[in-house]
Amino acid sequence: MRIVLQKVSEGSVDVVDETSGEVDTTFEPQHIGIGYVLLVGVEDTDGAKQIDWLAHKIANLRVFEDENGKMNRSIHDVDGSVLSISQFTLYADVRKGNRPSFVKAGAPDHAEQVWHAFNDALRAQGLDVKEGRFGAHMRVSLTNDGPVTIIFDTDELGI
């Protein structure tokens, strides 16, 4: 799995109807205050091991400032929330040509299952998790705090 974590003071997502270009009213826009916006990419080899490790690490990561201005508080400590966005483009391969290849991204059925399982694992860690819509054209807005952006790649981490 590949995750781009951004510490935010707020974040939101809505879905755009690809035919009309208008906001899709069948999707209730999601909004969080302080917390994380997670861009989540899945590959076919991802499963429970990657899900569990990432959910635990993200839930306990200390990147929020304490009273001394040090990154020493977790998302739990600040009563933060998570906005999780599926994003297969994190597996773009741009080595050849000018159009990215996404062959390393997980098959849609598998990726959707893993993404939902990951969101559930975050909830099991006690986090409030809002979601975009898998496979949809979304508009994601966020206000970075810091900025703090951390990239997790379970392949590179050997997980």
From Swiss-Prot:
Superkingdom of this protein's organism: Bacteria
Compartments it resides in: Cytoplasm
Signal peptide: none
Motif (Gly-cisPro motif, important for rejection of L-amino acids): 146-147
Keywords, sorted A to Z: Cytoplasm, Hydrolase, RNA-binding, tRNA-binding
GO biological processes: D-amino acid catabolic process
GO cellular component: cytoplasm
One Pfam family in the UniProt entry: Tyr_Deacylase
Catalytic activity: glycyl-tRNA(Ala) + H2O = tRNA(Ala) + glycine + H(+); a D-aminoacyl-tRNA + H2O = a tRNA + a D-alpha-amino acid + H(+)
Gene Ontology molecular-function annotations: D-tyrosyl-tRNA(Tyr) deacylase activity; Gly-tRNA(Ala) deacylase activity; Ser(Gly)-tRNA(Ala) hydrolase activity; tRNA binding
Keyword check for tRNA-binding: yes
SUPFAM superfamilies associated with the record: DTD-like
Enzyme nomenclature, EC number: 3.1.1.96
Domain observations: A Gly-cisPro motif from one monomer fits into the active site of the other monomer to allow specific chiral rejection of L-amino acids.
Function: An aminoacyl-tRNA editing enzyme that deacylates mischarged D-aminoacyl-tRNAs. Also deacylates mischarged glycyl-tRNA(Ala), protecting cells against glycine mischarging by AlaRS. Acts via tRNA-based rather than protein-based catalysis; rejects L-amino acids rather than detecting D-amino acids in the active site. By recycling D-aminoacyl-tRNA to D-amino acids and free tRNA molecules, this enzyme counteracts the toxicity associated with the formation of D-aminoacyl-tRNA entities in vivo and helps enforce protein L-homochirality.
Family classification: Belongs to the DTD family.
Protein name, UniProt field: D-aminoacyl-tRNA deacylase
Organism: Bifidobacterium adolescentis (strain ATCC 15703 / DSM 20083 / NCTC 11814 / E194a)
